[in-house]
Amino acid sequence: MTESTSRRPAYARLLDRAVRILAVRDHSEQELRRKLAAPIMGKNGPEEIDATAEDYERVIAWCHEHGYLDDSRFVARFIASRSRKGYGPARIRQELNQKGISREATEKAMRECDIDWCALARDQATRKYGEPLPTVFSEKVKIQRFLLYRGYLMEDIQEIWRNFAD
């Protein structure tokens, strides 16, 4: 940190850091708080910002007021991103929980998203195991295990086999 930046008030330095973090991608409020509290790597090693709890609260409030920090927008974008990468609803819920998003906000966003989880599970299975999907029991178990690991629900996985003749 240069001499001129070390003289800036802690609030201004925290606000600058928050805007830089949020400029890269959306974050949940909990993620932003964690990143703001982490030491900054400077030329001479890690440097702490001597900020009070009130400074952190003011920065978070400012980010909310100016639209930089919005948990509902973060959740919607996170669900869309993770589903495009082939992850199922159970895994996405778990990751959102780890990021500090409430169960109510997660469930609301999951209901509002327009994703056919069964079709997505089938796409993942055919991408990994080929078309047509194997009918041998041991191969079905492998596919089921793979899809469960990816976060798909058992009912969506079973639907693949029910609609297999289609």
Swiss-Prot record:
Q: Which GO terms describe its molecular function?
A: enzyme binding
For biological process, the GO terms are:
DNA damage response; DNA repair; regulation of DNA repair; SOS response
- What keywords appear on the UniProt entry? Cytoplasm, DNA damage, DNA repair, SOS response
Quote the subcellular location field of this record. Answer: Cytoplasm
Q: Does the keyword RNA-binding apply?
A: no
Cited InterPro entries: RecX_HTH_1st (IPR053926), RecX_HTH_2nd (IPR053924), RecX_HTH_3rd (IPR053925), Regulatory_RecX (IPR003783), WH-like_DNA-bd_sf (IPR036388)
User: Where does this protein chiefly localize?
Assistant: cytoplasm
Query: Which conditions up-regulate this protein?
Result: By DNA damage, via LexA, as part of the SOS response.
Coiled coil (UniProt feature): none
Q: Which GO terms describe its cellular component?
A: cytoplasm
Functional summary from the UniProt entry? Modulates RecA activity through direct physical interaction. Can inhibit both RecA recombinase and coprotease activities. May have a regulatory role during the SOS response. Inhibits DNA strand exchange in vitro.
PANTHER family per the record? REGULATORY PROTEIN RECX FAMILY PROTEIN
Q: Which family does it belong to?
A: Belongs to the RecX family.
NCBIfam families membership:
PRK00117.1-1
- What is the protein name stated in its UniProt record? Regulatory protein RecX
Q: Which organism is it from?
A: Escherichia coli (strain K12)
Name of the gene this protein is made from? recX
